[in-house]
Amino acid sequence: MRLVQLSRHSIAFPSPEGALREPNGLLALGGDLSPARLLMAYQRGIFPWFSPGDPILWWSPDPRAVLWPESLHISRSMKRFHKRSPYRVTMNYAFGQVIEGCASDREEGTWITRGVVEAYHRLHELGHAHSIEVWREDELVGGMYGVAQGTLFCGESMFSRMENASKTALLVLCEEFIGHGGKLIDCQVLNDHTASLGACEIPRRDYLNYLNQMRLGRLPNNFWVPRCLFSPQE
């Protein structure tokens, strides 16, 4: 196993099975963040993650963290909160604000550089990257974004500026996703937060098998149309 240097003249990736064991899942470096390369990466179970000033690094970890939407863990306190939620939840109303929120709401720093913001905004304009927004009246207080692959959604990042805002985004997305034929949410790498919400680890090989099946699936044509998903009760 060796780290592969990508060419700027080809969007091809090596097999994820050749990724390093340490650091877990590091597969390649270099290339660019063009829409064609990003889409090729997601179709192969690969995603970019790197620190500012470093070359672009591409990953496909083993195991892979995923969330089956029907297995989302909602605590009793969250259920009570959501019943009386003051939030309005929308889809694809403010992609730019959401990714900027994810980039800025990281005290320890962020991998979401200006180049990353611009790259995913291009994917959004092409209809591949999507956002969920959580509003308190007219203020954006939380949200998440990711990349669609058929009936699989690759979650990239989320942020929260008020109580339970990001959890509300995920809860409403899962309900909407299941209701329209969505199957699986990719969480990339398990952490305490995603584990508490019901995410689990599966072998990379299993994830790639699911991906190959689900990326060919289809949600309703109007699923990702900008719309309101949830409004607070009067």
Swiss-Prot record:
One of its GO terms (cellular component) is cytoplasm. Its EC number is 2.3.2.6. It catalyses: N-terminal L-lysyl-[protein] + L-leucyl-tRNA(Leu) = N-terminal L-leucyl-L-lysyl-[protein] + tRNA(Leu) + H(+); N-terminal L-arginyl-[protein] + L-leucyl-tRNA(Leu) = N-terminal L-leucyl-L-arginyl-[protein] + tRNA(Leu) + H(+); L-phenylalanyl-tRNA(Phe) + an N-terminal L-alpha-aminoacyl-[protein] = an N-terminal L-phenylalanyl-L-alpha-aminoacyl-[protein] + tRNA(Phe). SUPFAM superfamilies: Acyl-CoA N-acyltransferases (Nat). The keyword Signal does not apply. The keyword Cytoplasm applies. InterPro entries: Acyl_CoA_acyltransferase, Leu/Phe-tRNA_Trfase, Leu/Phe-tRNA_Trfase_C, Leu/Phe-tRNA_Trfase_N. It comes from the Bacteria. One of its GO terms (biological process) is protein catabolic process. One of its GO terms (molecular function) is leucyl-tRNA--protein transferase activity. It is found in: Cytoplasm. Keywords: Acyltransferase, Cytoplasm, Transferase. Pfam families: Leu_Phe_trans. Functions in the N-end rule pathway of protein degradation where it conjugates Leu, Phe and, less efficiently, Met from aminoacyl-tRNAs to the N-termini of proteins containing an N-terminal arginine or lysine. NCBIfam families: aat. Belongs to the L/F-transferase family. PANTHER family: LEUCYL/PHENYLALANYL-TRNA--PROTEIN TRANSFERASE, LEUCYL_PHENYLALANYL-TRNA--PROTEIN TRANSFERASE. This is Leucyl/phenylalanyl-tRNA--protein transferase.
